[in-house]
């Protein structure tokens, strides 16, 4: 990322430490399957999820917070989505077996 982008990110937080923690947490969310907030054409064409997380933060579409409740809510939503996907796959397999 360009230095001006990093300066913008630093202005969104109260410290370099908080920026690094928030970026790392977002990268972990992306690795866990969280959808990107960036439009497809702006997504990073790299496996470096830290860079993608920083670009997402730079857009302003994500807010920097420390709320544990937000993290828990994200995790619960992710688990629900994953369970729904698995259930849909199981239902599709059952339908194929019936045919």
Swiss-Prot record:
Summary of subunit composition and partner proteins: The RNAP catalytic core consists of 2 alpha, 1 beta, 1 beta' and 1 omega subunit. When a sigma factor is associated with the core the holoenzyme is formed, which can initiate transcription.
The protein's name: DNA-directed RNA polymerase subunit omega
Catalytic activity: RNA(n) + a ribonucleoside 5'-triphosphate = RNA(n+1) + diphosphate
One Pfam family from the record: RNA_pol_Rpb6
Annotated organism of origin: Deinococcus deserti (strain DSM 17065 / CIP 109153 / LMG 22923 / VCD115)
SS bond list: none
Alphabetical list of InterPro entries matching this protein: DNA-dir_RNA_pol_omega, Pol_omega/Rpo6/RPB6, RPB6/omega-like_sf
GO cellular component: DNA-directed RNA polymerase complex
NCBIfam families: rpoZ
Biological processes, Gene Ontology terms: DNA-templated transcription
One Gene Ontology molecular-function label: DNA binding
Family matches, as Gene3D superfamilies: 3.90.940.10
Cited function: Promotes RNA polymerase assembly. Latches the N- and C-terminal regions of the beta' subunit thereby facilitating its interaction with the beta and alpha subunits.
Broadest EC class assigned to this enzyme: transferase
EC nos: 2.7.7.6
Keywords, in A-Z order: DNA-directed RNA polymerase, Nucleotidyltransferase, Transcription, Transferase
Family: Belongs to the RNA polymerase subunit omega family.
């Amino acid at each position: 990322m360009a230095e001006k982008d990093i300066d913008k990110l630093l202005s969104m937080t109260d410290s370099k430490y908080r920026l690094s923690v928030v970026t790392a947490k977002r990268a972990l969310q992306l690795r866990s399957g969280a959808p990107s907030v960036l439009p497809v054409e702006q997504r990073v064409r790299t496996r470096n999820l830290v860079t993608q997380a920083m670009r997402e933060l730079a857009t302003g579409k994500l807010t920097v917070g420390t709320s544990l409740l937000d993290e828990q809510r994200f995790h619960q939503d992710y688990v629900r989505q994953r369970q729904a996907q698995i259930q849909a796959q199981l239902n599709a397999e059952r339908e194929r077996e019936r045919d």
